[in-house]
Each structure stands twice: as C-alpha cells, then as structure tokens.
A protein has these predicted regions:
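Carbohydrate-recognition loop of C-type lectin domains
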Residues: 1-124
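An aromatic-glycine-centered, glycine-rich loop/turn in mixed alpha/beta architecture
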Residues: 104-175
Length: 175
C-alpha cells in the first residue's frame, strides 16, 4: 500500500503479478474507475500472449493488486472480452526464404502488434494499413498482394475492456 492508486498504478500492478514460477501473467490491462463513491476500480486484463487470461491468472492478478491497493479502493479484476480476428493474405515470397519461416514470422509479428495495441487509451483500432505494413516488413515478403481482416479491407475498432484476439492468419504464398 502507499501508492495513490491511479489508473497507471493499477495497470503497472496488473503487469507485475507473477505465478509460482515467477512468470508474468498479464500482458496488459485497462482500468475503469467510475466516480460514484463506491471505491470500485475495474481492471480488465489480457494474458502475455494477447489472449483471454485463465481464471487462475485473473486470481493471481486480483490477489497481487489487493496487496498494493490504497485503503478504500475495491479493485475488481476480470478478463477482457475478445474480438476474434482472422487475417487472410496473399504474399509474394522472396527467393531464399522458406514458406514456413515467412508464415511463422508473419504470425509472430502480427501477434506482437495485437499485444502492443491491446489496451491503448480509449477506442482501440486495428489499422488495416498497419497490419499490411507489418506483413510487408517481414524478411522474405516481397509484396502483399491481397489482405483482409475479418473478411473486409478495412480497420476495425474495440471499445473499453475488449481486445483483439488473433484466431488465425491464413497466408497463401507465391514466389
């Protein structure tokens, strides 16, 4: 205890919580503090892999925050609600790179972006052009020929306590 318990503190505490093996359990968090006099502070978390956390991970974060919270605060930790995302793309591959290596790197880089944007302030946008740029920047990709996000060639948005969950990246490759 001792901190003021502002929203940044709750995000920091959520990200500090570790399991019995010392591994962080929350990749990011977003906080809502209604100004209604109840002392309730709602903390929605995602896992370190940008997926919905397990009940155990939620409990670990709840218990950790309970040790840090200021007197009078009532933190309530929950899983953020996921918005499933499927990305379908067609790329031209550069010679000298294996198809599997390129696909694996695209998947990893897109997943890293999902975690990075998981809980930006306000409405979160999964920007169509940013995703295209991420794929284009992968070593072995010479061109992104076609791209859709959830069947559309457009950005999508998520409100408070929601995050994007990457359900699949379907990649067709030509040289």
């Amino acid at each position: 205890m001792g901190a003021s318990g502002n929203e940044k503190h709750y995000v920091k505490w959520a990200k500090e919580a570790t399991d019995a093996q010392g591994k962080r359990v929350a990749g990011n968090a977003k906080v809502s503090s209604p100004r209604d006099g109840t002392g309730n502070v709602y903390i929605a978390i995602v896992s370190t892999t940008a997926q919905a956390p397990t009940e155990e991970e939620i409990q670990i974060v709840q218990e950790y925050i309970n040790t840090k919270r200021p007197v009078g605060a009532n933190p309530v930790v929950s899983a953020a609600e996921s918005i499933d995302v499927t990305i379908v793309c067609e790329i031209h591959k550069t010679a000298g790179y294996t198809e599997e290596t390129v696909k694996s790197q695209i998947q990893a880089d897109v997943q890293a972006h999902f975690l990075e944007i998981a809980f930006q302030s306000g409405v979160i946008s999964l920007n169509f052009f940013k995703v295209s740029n991420i794929i284009s920047a992968v070593n072995g990709v010479s061109e992104v020929v076609d791209l859709t996000i959830n069947g559309k060639k457009d950005s999508i948005t998520a409100d408070y306590n929601k995050f994007f969950s990457l359900k699949g990246v379907i990649i067709s490759v030509t040289e």
